[in-house]
From Swiss-Prot:
It comes from the Eukaryota. This is A disintegrin and metalloproteinase with thrombospondin motifs 20. GO terms for cellular component: extracellular space. May play a role in tissue-remodeling process occurring in both normal and pathological conditions. May have a protease-independent function in the transport from the endoplasmic reticulum to the Golgi apparatus of secretory cargos, mediated by the GON domain. Binds 1 zinc ion per subunit. The gene is Adamts20. Keywords: Cleavage on pair of basic residues, Disulfide bond, Extracellular matrix, Glycoprotein, Hydrolase, Metal-binding, Metalloprotease, Protease, Repeat, Secreted, Signal, Zinc, Zymogen. Residues 201-222, 1265-1295 are annotated as: Disordered.
Amino acid sequence: MRVAKWLTGLLCPISLLLTGSWEVRFHPRQEALVKTLASYEVVTPTRVNEFGDVFPQNRHFSRKKRSSGVPEPPPFRTHYRISAYGQLFQLNLSADAAFLAAGYTEVHLGTPVPGPGGRSTESPDLRHCFYRGQVNAREDHTAVFSLCGGLMGTFKANDGEYFLEPVLRADGSAHDDDHNKPHLIYRQELKRNSFARSHKPCEVSENQMEKTALPSQSSRNTTGDVDIEEEAVFRLEGERSQLHSRNKRFLSYPRYVEVMVTADAKMVHHHGQNLQHYVLTLMSIVAAIYKDSSIGNLINIVIVKLVVIHSEQEGPVISFNAATTLRNFCLWQQSQNVPDDAHPSHHDTAVLITREDICGAKEKCDTLGLAELGTLCDPSRSCSISEENGLSAAFTIAHELGHVFNVPHDDSFKCKEAGIKHQYHVMAPTLNYHTSPWTWSACSQKHITEFLDTGHGECLLDKPNGRTYDLSPQLPGSVYDGNRQCELMFGPGSQVCPYLKHCRRLWCTSAEGVHKGCRTQHMPLADGTSCGPGMHCHRGLCVTRDMETRPVDGEWGPWGPYSSCSRTCGGGIKSTARLCDRPEPRNGGRYCVGRRMKFRSCNTDSCPKGKRDFREKQCSDFDGKHFDINGLPPNVRWLPKYSGIAVKDRCKLYCRVAGTTSFYQLKDRVADGTPCGTETNDICVQGLCRQAGCDHVLNSKAKRDKCGVCGGDNSSCQTLAGVFNSAHYGYNVVVKIPAGATNIEILQHSYSGRPEDDNYLALSDTQGNFLLNGNFVVSMAKKEINIQGAVFEYSGSNNSIERINSTDRLEAELVLQVLCVGNLYNPDVRYSFNIPIEERSNLFSWDPYGPWQDCTKMCQGLHRRKIACVRKSDHAVVSDHNCGHLPMPLFVTEKCNMDCELRWHIIGKSDCSSQCGQGYRTLDVHCMKYSVHKGQAVPVGDQYCGDQLKPPSREPCHGSCVLTRWHYSEWSQCSRSCGGGDKTRESYCVNGFGHRLAESECRELPRVVLENCNEFPCPSWATSEWSECPVTCGKGMKQRQVWCQLSEDPMRDGFCNASTKPESLRPCELRACASWHVGPWGSCTATCGHGYQMRAVKCISEIFGTMLDDRECPQASRPSDRQDCILAPCLAIPEVGATSLPAIPLGRAAQWRHGSWTPCSVSCGRGSQARYVSCRDAHDEVADESNCAHLPRPAAVSLCFSPCGEWQAGDWSPCSASCGHGKTTRRVLCVNYHQLVDESYCDPEGRPVTEQECSLAACPPLYSRAPSSSEQPSHVPSRNVPLTHKPGENQDQGAQLSIRGNQWRTGPWGACSRSCAGGLQHRAVVCQDEDGRSATSCDGSSKPPESRHCGSGPCPHWNYGDWGECTQTCGGGVKSRFVICQFPNGQMTQEHSCELPKPPSMMQCHLHACPEDVSWYRGPWKSCSASCGKGVKYREVLCIDQFQRKLEEKYCSHLHKPRTHKACRSGRCPSWKANKWKECSVTCGSGVQQREVYCRLRGTGRVSEDMCDPSTRPQGQRQCWRQDCMRYQWTTGDWLDCSTSCKKKETYRLVKCVNEQNVQANESLCDPLTKPLSIKKCRNPHCKYSVVTGDSSQCAGNCGFTSPQKITYCTKIQSSKKHTFHQLRPVVYGECPVIPSPQAYKCDLRSCLHVATWKVGKWSKCSVTCGIGIMERRVACRTENGWPSDLCLKRLKPDAQKKCYANDCKLLTTCKELQVTNNVTKDGDYDLNVRGRILKIHCSGMQLENPREYLPLVKSEDNFSEIYGLRLQNPYECPFNGSRRPDCACENDYLPAGYTVFSKVRVDLESMQIKTADLLFSQTLSGKAVPFATAGDCYSAARCPQGQFSINLAGTGMKISNTAKWLAQGRYASVIIHRSQDGTKVYGRCGGFCGKCIPHMATGLSIQVL
């Protein structure tokens, strides 16, 4: 053991030295981390651009945590390069902050207290930090990093996952040098404890445990709950909770739990800067738990706020006492909440995470969390607390949140009661080895579902917006490794137990070491924690990382069968449910949304009379059960409790103890179908009160009418009412109420208006047995009486109005009586009830002409009119039971939907299964709806064609056996979803074996790569007419219907564009509203005791404030104008004598009341109006007028005036004086509609004045003589009077000399008295002397004129047309006419130019009342007038009465007449369709080009050409011209020599077709009739033979000779023109024509030859697995003894090879197809069909979902890329003529320099491009890795490139495409490219200062098959 420890201690420093990290001093946290690692490295990441160029040093880590100021915008993409573990990692990253919401904020309370990693209160903006991308261009190698302050994150590579984080200084600060910042990198799967294998398991003592024990020990509680009412079976009446609003139930809605998470000060001190990240990691686990499918609901955990408490004084008081802490936190979180549920910061529940060691009780600190049951959506109680002890705290938070959802523990009584036992999941009371904390038990699912379905989760329905943020998608174990989880749970220094390593439980050592034992809190390791190479923990199991983790959304399974009926009568319920299991949601996928349960009514017939109440039966099931309640007898009997139960608790089973008022809740819910109460028809379903009708049907609205008939129409009964007011002592019979009576209402008004009364109601049966208030005993309290099933409510006698009422049907006759006692005041009994009508046969009848019902079929169907029962008196539709005794007439039927047909249509056919010979094809058959007039077809459900025989979906076919054919890919998606689009597919030419050929081989075959699709019209919005304004005055909103339709068929709104939806609401405004206004109350009419007071109530216009007639205001809301008043009691009047006057009863004071005035008695002029005036007593009853004599009687008649005309006033005339004061006048006329009438027809009080005074300038003084110089004038002339005139003025304006210097003076002309037709102008003319004084001696003959004519042209006048038609024929309409002001010549002018008042342009008409019950009948729309395109459709609109009889249209003219025609569109018209032109008919010269032209109807396809316009038919043929034809001829070669063999029979020569340039061409271009012979017979001499005797030898033993003999051979003499030689081998003697000499027969040679024979082996397997190959076998010449021999006859030698044919080749074109089809999972080289040629392709990643293809390179040394590293000191020269020289004046400091060779390159076989950035099969020999086909340098700016790349694809079957180009990048970049002739080799030299070349991004590095 000690040796092992010593070795371990020695190996760790050695490993650190090897990694070179001793140079770095780590922060203590990182120091502890590296001690647990098997290896790590310290590296410096380099930021590069997408081409690999290094960024300047100040641009490497530019991202900072933002606070204030204007930040630098982050790049969307960035690239980094890391060299570690002998590999080069290229990180291609893109910004990705999707997991953070736009409004994410933190709330910090208190001043931060520095601690371990203390932080500032300023929350950094983290959005710009986060990036996500790939490593080395591998899509499956993901990388997730934060770039703030360095690179922190993880990435995946071939050998596992790597973690990277900046190295912190020992004091915790970061390195300042951003561009040269050291980073720590380590692999996840290599993390080990350095002593993990040095110890064996040891025992763990109990005294070492803190909160947990080994599984063998007894576990203790880890979650404590305030389980109020959890174990209770019943509760008392006082227990109530708030009623929630109802919504649709039994539907799976998405729920959003908005959570406020609070971290206390201890959390801040412990986690420091990592707090936010850590808390979000915990909540991500919680969110994943609540997304598990086992919860049975779609619940989203959403964090809306994170509150960080730095100072304990700023937050709730947190102590060791769990209950107190929970109470304090609940109070505090309510103050942090926003009440508005729609506010972004509102939270539904609050979670406190604390590191305080909370305790459930004294000395019992094993509690990890606390919450109260069922408090979700309660603002003051929806909260929970959880103790943080590592990542396992997430399970505690989820557990406590489950309690908030009202979920009990998995071992609670409620779970056992439901029959669910031994399931321990999230809600397990304790955590042990058998607990599964990720999933939910069936009990938990049941309670969460019930909690939500019963309306307690309504606050979760709003989807949060704004300040919410997503949780991190990273698995928590990938961020916090196992050792870190131990530290979070048990403190620093704790490590994963080395001998208890499994995912199900996290076992940890103590800080002192493993020798102190291991401990656990029964929590599993976090998901994502490494558990082995390529493995990680997932829900307690160690699984491979490649396990499918994509989210899978759940889908509903089928509905199950309906359950049995819950009741045998009275309306039961059947239910069915479905599960979310097709598939079940996995890996965080969404739970199903929609209805999970359906219900239907059953056994709806009413129960027979006398059957026990259903709720009573359920209570009686508990008879004899007392539940250990004190005071209950053993044989207790339970009765239903109806009254006094809260509305929300009506569906719980409350029962009371018989004989007492005590009641208890015995069950959480009553049986389905139980009525919610006695006063309603609603029934309970699954604990909820659901609507039902009196017919006991769920969701029915049927109600009983006043006759007690369910669904009745009040026509089967009549109402009887009466009054009884006579009194005799004792019981007085009021009325007998017969059996069958319903709606019984009995009132007895107290004579004094007080409850104290001596008259009381009573009920008895016909035998005199009292049922209420009998035997002079009266019930004062309210009560209910059940009389043979009819429930009567009695108000009790202690009411001023005593009341008995019942709505039920009375089954037996009752006698209503009134008991009179005491002073025998007359009773005031008022009663009413309904009794059935006995004789109804002649009251009702069947009407067969009801509304049309739905058509029986979508097309070619029938519909019929509904037969309704109507009342004969008014033809009103009544319930059918009223006509039940009458025979029903025959239905009126009519054909419907005749404009369409339903037919099976073959939409498409597959290709024939056999390419040659008999096969079959599948047919795509659908039901289509064909429009007869529109000419279009729409697919419908197949069920609509169910009455027709469906064509078979398979038909025989025959392959064309063509040698070539077009092979197609799948069709693409249609370019448009409606309105006609196109879809395309790819095609290529193949032969019969599926091998790809040149397209020219198939050019004669039709090629279909484009097809029309989705040619049906798009849905569009349709609108109805605007409704009338819904208000009678003021402002309102009128509306219209807006719907989405397709060819007039309604569709869901989602099918139409929401942005173009027309408005459905529009404001409207009518005349101003009138409202009641009240004045102050007057004085009381009494001075003591009771009286009343009055006030004024007026109807006032809201806008003008004028008083209106009372009829303009709503009478129902008229305020009272009278109220009682009570003053001090009156003094008692002492008695005088034995008798006194009877006292006036209090409240008997009378007053005058009056109604509103009637309309005036005349329509115009003076008349009279009247009103009703009456004397009313205190009860508002009519009293004798003598009782009101003390008050003045209001007038009952008044004079009134209704003006017949109106006053019209003209313009004022000019002032009568030219100066000073005068008068002006105008005309005032009484006009009625432009006609002058007598002034008596106008209101004299409103007559305008006709005369008024006018004032002008003061007049000048007049003098009778000239004053002397000594006299002073008595008046100074006004300044306004001119004293002098300028000479030369005309007569009008100048002065005229007169006698002695006097002259006339004139003033300015006044305004013209008229603007037209001879008006007058006036001016002042005065005589003045030289001094300007008034004189009288001016020459009268020369006096200027005082007036003159003015105004030119005639005056305009009013012109008007005839009155138009009245808008209504009755009920008051309006007619109008055109009124204009114009001159006699017809010229129009402004209206004010006409002097007379404007005649009215509108007036009322047809004021008589309209006839009732008429309406417009709208007939069905006729067919469209056009068979295609736009047209018009018409319908019949008739005026009919209530009996459907046709009337003249004038009777309906007051109603808006519906339109009789509208535009229509009958689908698209057929049109010509022209395909593309085919190839020219000749290859040279003049030919013909054709194309297919046909008539097409969209949606149907080809139709007859007669349907299209022949004049517009496109041309189907045209001439074409190719290049001039070449002349071809046959040419021959020389014949082969026949003399080479005496046996040769034929000779050959070469015959070929050549063009004019003697270039060989295809033989089809030459005339086959003139082709020369290529074969002819040889004429050779016969072969010559000779006999040759060989040396002596022994014959074979079996040849018959035993002595040596000379062997004689027969040989053939070969002769040619130059040589004669012998054949080397003998021939058979039978063929030899030469007879040998006798001595030659020494051996029996013929016998020897026959002994040697050919021997053959077995055929080998075919050389190919598919297609045509070769089979081989061994053939050898052997003797009988098996010896090899040369004596076998060659012509008899069997074949050693032959052709073979394997199965048809399935052309595998990608590694993915190879993986799926042949189930290949091993990486390696495989033969794939690449564009018709079989090539060797390397498949990599065959065990992954998407393997990749690589092209093996024959010579890797010829495939390299280089970035040259030397740089000239003088960059503006090119030394050595551009050659490389090591002795150049250069510096070797170019950082991107590198040299990479490639053994394989990745190819995209679909786009035929090489992925140059893939470096998987590359080796970097020096420097940095360089992508394929890339070169560059920083050598020179003088076009002297030194960087080079080489491509050699020889032997691969591919070449570089001619379209491949290289792009120069950088400064002074130059590119030199050399290609081989066959395209297999490319060499390039690139460079600049600094520059490089890469394949052009637009084309990529394209390749082609040779």
